[in-house]
Amino acid sequence: MSSKANHAKTVICGIINVTPDSFSDGGQFFALEQALQQARKLIAEGASMLDIGGESTRPGSSYVEIEEEIQRVVPVIKAIRKESDVLISIDTWKSQVAEAALAAGADLVNDITGLMGDEKMAYVVAEARAKVVIMFNPVMARPQHPSSLIFPHFGFGQTFTEKELADFETLPIEDLMVAFFERALARAAEAGIAPENILLDPGIGFGLTKKENLLLLRDLDKLHQKGYPIFLGVSRKRFVINILEENGFEVNPETELGFRNRDTASAHVTSIAARQGVEVVRVHDVASHRMAVEIASAIRLADEAENLDLKQYK
């Protein structure tokens, strides 16, 4: 699906991290009632989708055992589903967690390993006829790259051969993303996942340099040319905050201004993404991002706007 074919407004996916250690909101929604209250808040602010995660993927985070992850996310999914038909995404790379979450009422699997971390994941998604976000994961493709070393290991075992990893090291970032997606999409096809159930995520903030992050964001339309909707997560990512810091803005999250600046900057990126026709943005602060989406989508869909004159504005 190209941006030209996307005649709908960008969907806002609100984040609920049911973890004690996520980089932005770890611990805030660890209890079931807190998570449910946050879900209600995000929906009221305009989220059409919620992304539920039970394991932090920030630099330095620890592996969460499968049963523990299931115990964190399934009660939250069941509670949300009991009172809302909002789309629910389960943020996990483990097939057993995905299977339990889908059975509990989730609609979509958001796999940060792009189906490459657990060889059973593609079959779980196919069996459930669920949608799946396949993320480009540079940490897995370039584990020895300086930008990857601070991240935890993703996946069971080694996903790529030593020769593949050596070849990946020399590829420009956009070529590396294409190579990764070719492998991931082949796995999806082999398992029987329907192409219309696939979204692609460029993996912003995962093992990328500042320049690589910016290049991938600038050229999102090239990713659209692969024929799939885009799912984008840039909210409160470190490289966005670094740009603010380099230019003298307050970014300390302990201050009201610093915290607000992080969301304002993230919303600016969402505006650029929505202008390019990105289908889904994954965000923490739905209210600010919704404003960005409304304005950017109105500009992108200008041909469909009402031709009001000044007298008709009230």
Swiss-Prot record:
One of its GO terms (cellular component) is cytosol. (7,8-dihydropterin-6-yl)methyl diphosphate binds at T57, D91, N110, D201, K237, R282, V283, H284. GO terms for biological process: folic acid biosynthetic process; tetrahydrofolate biosynthetic process. GO terms for molecular function: dihydropteroate synthase activity; metal ion binding. It catalyses: (7,8-dihydropterin-6-yl)methyl diphosphate + 4-aminobenzoate = 7,8-dihydropteroate + diphosphate. Its EC number is 2.5.1.15. Residues 10-294 form the Pterin-binding domain. It is an enzyme of class 2 (transferase). InterPro entries: DHP_synth-like, DHP_synth_dom, Dihydropteroate_synth-like_sf, Pterin-binding_dom. Mg(2+) binds at N17. Pathway: Cofactor biosynthesis; tetrahydrofolate biosynthesis; 7,8-dihydrofolate from 2-amino-4-hydroxy-6-hydroxymethyl-7,8-dihydropteridine diphosphate and 4-aminobenzoate: step 1/2. The keyword Magnesium applies. Its cofactor is Mg(2+). Gene3D superfamilies: Dihydropteroate synthase-like (3.20.20.20). Keywords: Folate biosynthesis, Magnesium, Metal-binding, Transferase. It comes from the Bacteria. The sequence shown here is that of sul-s (wild-type). The protein of the spontaneous mutation to sulfonamide resistance (sul-d) has an insert of 2 AA. Belongs to the DHPS family. Homodimer or homotrimer. Catalyzes the condensation of para-aminobenzoate (pABA) with 6-hydroxymethyl-7,8-dihydropterin diphosphate (DHPt-PP) to form 7,8-dihydropteroate (H2Pte), the immediate precursor of folate derivatives. This is Dihydropteroate synthase. It comes from Streptococcus pneumoniae serotype 4 (strain ATCC BAA-334 / TIGR4).
